[in-house]
UniProtKB/Swiss-Prot annotation:
Official protein name in the record: Large ribosomal subunit protein bL31B
Family stated for the protein in its record: Belongs to the bacterial ribosomal protein bL31 family. Type B subfamily.
Gene3D superfamilies named in the record: Ribosomal protein L31
Native organism taxonomy: Bacteria, Bacillati, Bacillota, Bacilli, Lactobacillales
Keyword terms: Ribonucleoprotein, Ribosomal protein
Any one Gene Ontology molecular-function term assigned to this protein's record: structural constituent of ribosome
PANTHER family, alphabetized: 50S RIBOSOMAL PROTEIN L31, CHLOROPLASTIC (PTHR33280), LARGE RIBOSOMAL SUBUNIT PROTEIN BL31C (PTHR33280:SF1)
Subunit comment: Part of the 50S ribosomal subunit.
GO biological process, one term: translation
One Pfam family from the record: Ribosomal_L31
Cellular component GO terms held in the UniProt record: ribonucleoprotein complex; ribosome
Species in which this protein is naturally found: Streptococcus uberis (strain ATCC BAA-854 / 0140J)
């Protein structure tokens, strides 16, 4: 087996930016941001949707404030919502 070809697998804190929920998990993702979590310092990865805010896992519909790419495009060019016209 060749050495040094696999990324480092380490504990990382994920922060759900919608709800503020934080959880510790293993990941190969890297980040320059760090956070103090349970007395230790870990790299911080920000996510828009996690198991705390996704309707499939919560069992209820939550509306998030995060706009999608289509919404940002429509706002930028002043287009009206195509679904609202129907």
């Amino acid at each position: 087996m060749r050495k040094d070809i696999h990324p480092d697998y380490r504990p990382v804190v994920f922060l759900d930016t919608t709800t503020g929920y934080k959880f510790l998990s293993g990941s190969t993702k890297s980040s320059k941001e760090t956070i103090e979590f349970e007395g230790e310092t870990y790299p911080l990865i920000r996510v828009e949707i996690s198991s705390d805010s996704h309707p499939f896992y919560t069992g209820r519909q939550k509306f998030t404030q995060a706009d999608g790419r289509v919404d940002r495009f429509n706002k930028k060019y002043g287009l009206k919502d195509a679904n609202a016209a129907k």
